[in-house]
Amino acid sequence: MGSCVSKGKGDDDSVHNVEFSGGNVHLITTKESWDDKLAEADRDGKIVVANFSATWCGPCKIVAPFFIELSEKHSSLMFLLVDVDELSDFSSSWDIKATPTFFFLKNGQQIGKLVGANKPELQKKVTSIIDSVPESPQRP
């Protein structure tokens, strides 16, 4: 397991070659897009898995493909990605001390949190959440 503590943005763009979003991961670029996705999740009865990450963070780069893989396997959840440098004020409001930090949200409220790139623990949390949610009836 690893995590990175906050650091200033560097001028080294070579770290941007890792795919952080893809699959069913929605990249959040504004507070408004965050609010829109949370409203969509609430409307659709989905639990949100939010990954607060940084492009310069080694453990974030390691866990990113796994996060994408989880998003593809578990379409009943909504997976969001927030770049802590791009949305620094917003990330600070979530009290992010290290990256990656994963929040699990239901109806906009935190129901779980995981700090660090611990793939087995992330898998365990996702599985636990899926197992705890009753099957939703099909919408007309």
From Swiss-Prot:
Resulting phenotype, G2A: Loss of membrane localization. Loss of cell to cell movement
Biological process, per Gene Ontology: cell communication
Disrupted-gene phenotype: Dwarf plants with short roots and small yellowish leaves.
Principal localisation: membrane
PROSITE patterns associated with the record: THIOREDOXIN_1, THIOREDOXIN_2
Localisation: Cell membrane
Record-listed Phosphoserine modification sites: S14, S136
Active site: C57 (nucleophile), C60 (nucleophile)
Reported impact of C4W: No effect on membrane localization. Loss of cell to cell movement
Keywords assigned: Cell membrane, Disulfide bond, Electron transport, Lipoprotein, Membrane, Myristate, Palmitate, Phosphoprotein, Redox-active center, Transport
Annotated GO CC locations: cytosol; plasma membrane; plastid
Entry-linked Pfam families: Thioredoxin
Residues the record marks as site: Contributes to redox potential value: G58, P59
Disulphide-bridged cysteine pairs: C57-C60
Gene Ontology molecular functions: oxidoreductase activity
Tissue and organ expression note: Ubiquitous.
SUPFAM superfamilies registered for this protein in UniProt: Thioredoxin-like
Keyword Aminoacyl-tRNA synthetase found: no
Thioredoxin domain mapped to chain residues: 25-129
Covalent lipidation (N-myristoyl glycine), chain numbering: G2
Lipidation (S-palmitoyl cysteine): C4
Function: Probable thiol-disulfide oxidoreductase that may play a role in intercellular communication due to its ability to move from cell to cell.
Protein family membership: Belongs to the thioredoxin family. Plant H-type subfamily.
Protein name: Thioredoxin H9
Classification of source organism: Eukaryota, Viridiplantae, Streptophyta, Embryophyta, Tracheophyta
Encoding gene, per UniProt annotation: TRX9
